[in-house]
Regions:
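Short, conserved glycine- and acidic-residue-centered signature motifs
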Residues: 2, 76, 186
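Conserved alpha/beta catalytic core and glycan-binding cleft of carbohydrate-active enzymes
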Residues: 159-161, 173-313
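Extracellular structured ligand-interaction cores
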Residues: 6-7, 64, 269
Length: 313
């Protein structure tokens, strides 16, 4: 069956509700509307953007502090379990956006946990990420065990169907910079974690968000790959959206943006994303990205989604 998923940020979709004690909708409250929306729009999976406990109500949750606790903003762990169970009963799979790259700097988190750089690199050059957070030191066995245990915890205890791992280029390359070379400890960490998760939960889905040319992301660990099931095709997303922004009379010179992905798609097993990264910070919605007047945008958006559904992969 075709995998058709929708990213879900509970905070952005349901905002706040003054009728609830802490001002947020609960997992129980959103379940009926969420499932109805997903089914009506033909999705068979949802991907919950990070729900590990995190500081800052306005954030998307990518800088975690609690790797074994769902955020209490939306209710209890048991309520989240019920939400996932109801999705499964409706035939909808649930994936979790998992962040094994970096964590929040806040004092009540993992930074300098025992007064030393226990989880993070001691050198600022590689210890602090581009987002101002702490990079995990994947060379330490204790750190690897912590992250592997967290990943398994969400699959085993909450019955998530899989994990989408965020920004793995920052694990594979020092600070995500291919010119600085491969981080062999990070590379080994991903292989060991993915192999272990597949051994304990053979049916789980492991998805990599990676925009680099690192080879073998979706190849088996046994043959030297990283062991992911799918890799986001970020190049397809950027090229395709650029094409649809182009005035129609100039598109004949830009057809390569539609066809280039056909040259490399056999190398990996790709998922085609149209992700939150493309409408954050004023980048506009998919409809707004289409060229032309308001009414002209709709047929182009339909063509975009049709191309996405029919693309090989």
């Amino acid at each position: 069956a075709c995998l058709v998923g929708s990213e879900m940020c509970i905070r952005d979709r349901w905002k706040t509700n003054p009728d609830y004690p802490n001002g947020w909708f609960t997992y129980d409250a959103i379940a009926p509307e969420l499932i109805e929306y997903v089914k009506e729009n033909g999705y068979n999976y949802i991907e919950l953007m990070p729900i590990c406990e995190h500081p800052c109500d306005s954030s998307w949750g990518y800088q975690n502090t609690g790797y074994f606790s769902p955020t209490s903003r939306y209710g209890t762990a048991q309520q989240l379990m019920r939400l996932i169970d109801l999705c499964h009963q409706a035939g909808v799979g649930v994936l979790l956006d998992f962040v094994p790259v970096h964590f929040a700097l806040d004092d009540y988190g993992l930074a300098r946990f025992d007064g030393t750089n226990l989880y993070e690199y001691p050198h600022p050059d590689v210890g602090v990420s581009e987002w101002g957070s702490c990079n995990f030191m994947h060379s330490r066995g204790e750190v690897r065990s912590f992250l592997q245990s967290s990943a398994w915890f969400w699959l085993e205890k909450f019955h998530f169907d899989g994990l989408r791992m965020d920004a793995i280029s920052r694990i594979l390359y020092w600070q995500g910079d291919e010119n600085r070379g491969v981080n062999r400890d990070g590379e080994a960490f991903l292989r060991v974690m993915n192999a272990g998760l597949k051994q304990r939960c053979p049916g789980c889905m492991l998805i990599a968000e990676d925009s680099t040319q690192y080879p073998g992301v979706t190849h088996p660990v046994e043959t030297g790959g990283l062991g992911f099931d799918y890799k986001w095709d970020m190049g397809w997303m950027n090229d395709t959206l650029d094409f649809f922004r182009t005035p129609p009379e100039k598109r004949s010179k830009h057809y390569h943006k539609l066809t280039f992905s056909m040259l490399y798609f056999p190398r990996e097993t790709y998922l085609l994303p149209l992700s939150h990264d493309e409408n954050v910070h004023g980048k506009a919605t998919i409809l707004q990205k289409m060229y032309g007047d308001y009414e002209d945008k709709f047929p182009q958006a339909r063509a975009l989604y049709l191309y996405m559904m029919m693309h090989p992969g």
